[in-house]
């Protein structure tokens, strides 16, 4: 752990998956995390840390001003991953990003927007369009801001990836999406470490992150990797693109009928079938190298799941 005292880092989205790890990584590097939360209680992941809490949300200007005041860096991690309409996404991913950037600039804090690699292809989905809109809003509010686009993030505490390992262990078959797609991945600890490095060393412009394999992975490699760390050998079955798109459209129809947003839908199906989700920025722009590749990252994650009781320790295929 670093011993040199650093400044205050303001963080939105601190109770989310990446945000929780980021707060810990910043504190361990000597920074003083200040987080925006809707409710006051400190998250269990931070119980042993000194974390300053500001109560409020992205729609509360006074809370954003308190969050940003005196901060050296402002990292905006908060975002919406499911909404029924583009307008619903934009209220958080565009308007919230703009409000955070404006508060940071007024306070004289360097601003870092954690966006998504999906923003590179805004025509694919409402989510992707809203993330690009958020980037554009931040550039307009603060041209000196750094925009960081992580790919798919996984690691300890991730509830989304848990289902992949459960399926890999128990199912005799695993679905494989487009055989031509390449998908970048990053372990959450690597993503947090890179953001901490950007706090130490100012970077401008746009950076796209990855793990040790900047050319990404095929869906076959990802599914085989998940099965491997679970000690399973399921058969891989290629899902046809039209079937995936149809499933997405049906989910959208049900979401509209029930007025219940879903992460998966036609837009997400298009994202999953897109051929290139690998970083285009120079590797040196990431600041620090990644530690984890796919297999050791998956192994580290599964070890955590088992220790936490999220996966049985004796689970077999």
Curated annotation (Swiss-Prot):
It is found in: Periplasm. Pfam families: Epimerase. Residues 1-27 form the signal peptide. It is an enzyme of class 1 (oxidoreductase). Its main location: periplasm. Pathway: Lipid metabolism; sphingolipid metabolism. Its EC number is 1.-.-.-. It catalyses: N-acyl-3-oxosphinganine + NADH + H(+) = an N-acylsphinganine + NAD(+). The bacterial ceramide synthesis pathway operates in a different order from that in eukaryotes. Furthermore, phylogenetic analyses support the hypothesis that the bacterial and eukaryotic ceramide pathways evolved independently. Belongs to the NAD(P)-dependent epimerase/dehydratase family. This is Ceramide reductase. It comes from Caulobacter vibrioides (strain NA1000 / CB15N) (Caulobacter crescentus).
């Amino acid at each position: 752990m670093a011993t040199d005292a650093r400044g205050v880092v303001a963080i939105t989205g601190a109770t989310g998956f990446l945000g929780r790890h980021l707060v810990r990584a910043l504190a361990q590097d000597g920074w003083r995390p200040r987080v925006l939360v809707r409710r006051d209680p400190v998250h269990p992941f931070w119980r042993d840390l000194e974390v300053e809490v500001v109560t409020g949300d992205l729609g509360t200007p006074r809370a954003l001003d308190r969050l940003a005041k005196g901060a050296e860096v402002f990292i905006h991690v908060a975002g919406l991953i499911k909404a029924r309409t583009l307008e619903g996404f934009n209220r958080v991913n565009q308007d919230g990003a703009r409000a955070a950037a404006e508060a940071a600039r007024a306070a004289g804090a360097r601003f870092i927007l954690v966006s998504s690699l999906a923003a590179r292809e805004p025509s694919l989905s409402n989510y992707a369009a809203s993330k690009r809109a958020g980037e554009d809003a931040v550039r307009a509010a603060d041209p000196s801001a750094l925009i960081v686009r992580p790919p798919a993030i996984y690691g300890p505490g991730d509830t989304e990836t848990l289902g992949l390992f459960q399926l890999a262990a128990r199912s005799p078959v695993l679905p494989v999406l487009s055989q031509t797609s390449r998908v970048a991945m990053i372990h959450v600890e690597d993503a947090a470490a890179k953001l901490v490095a950007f706090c130490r060393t100012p970077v401008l412009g746009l950076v796209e992150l990855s793990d040790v394999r900047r050319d990404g992975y095929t869906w076959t490699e990802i599914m085989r990797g998940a099965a491997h760390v679970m000690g399973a050998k399921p058969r891989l079955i290629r899902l046809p693109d039209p079937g995936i798109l149809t499933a997405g459209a049906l989910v959208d129809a049900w979401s509209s009928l029930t007025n219940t947003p879903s992460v998966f839908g036609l837009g997400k199906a298009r994202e999953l079938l897109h051929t290139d989700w690998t970083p285009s920025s120079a590797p040196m722009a990431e600041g620090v190298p990644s530690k984890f590749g796919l297999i050791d990252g998956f192994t580290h994650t599964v070890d955590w799941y088992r220790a936490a009781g999220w996966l049985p320790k004796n689970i077999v295929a």
